[in-house]
Amino acid sequence: AYRAGLAIRETLARRDSANTQWQRDLSVSHNKIGDVLLVQGDGPAALDAYRAGLAIAETLARRDPANTQWQRDLSVSHNRIGDVLRAQGDGPTALVAYRAGLAIAETLARRDPANTDWQRDLTVSHNKIGDVLLAQGDGPAALATYRAGLAIRETLARCDPANTEWQRDLFVSHTKIGNVLRAQGDGPAALAAYRAGLAIAETLAPRDPANTEWQRDLSVSHGKIG
């Protein structure tokens, strides 16, 4: 179905290259196909699809730098490519992609600090970069990046304590930071981070006993604290 849609959108995009909506639709189609290919385990083909979408997103973003939707599309495209590269073990190239996405996310977040979606996007970029840096053995840089994301997530969580997604984001940040600190041999600081995460997990888990993700988070927290 996605390929049939892609064929139609390619025809439309060729027919009128100045029609930005059709161009964006085509980029979305490439990304959806990439998502399917990735789930099927075909990383190289997914990467090709994502790069086709990225090329269109770059063209649109250059055409109108003030169009925040197109800028966000471009940031997401970079992150998708980074995800595939990282899964393939190509950390350095993944880092380049993630940093390209981060640069856009930072610009958007500065443009409208009240836009919580853009603020959250920025935290996601920080965490992706931190994950790669940690895998490369650069604990201090990973920690700094994770903490940059944590600061934003703390602000979001305070703004809306009822937003469970933001609360869980905060749990994830505390846990990532705890992992780095533990690896660095800083047990007391790691324990403080883990306990901050546990407090959130203990709040979320009773709220919805059927939510297996939250139940697992609680189990993981207890395991890390020991």
Residue locations for each model-derived region?
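Thr-biased low-complexity repeat/linker tracts and other Thr-enriched repetitive architectures
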Residues: 1-226
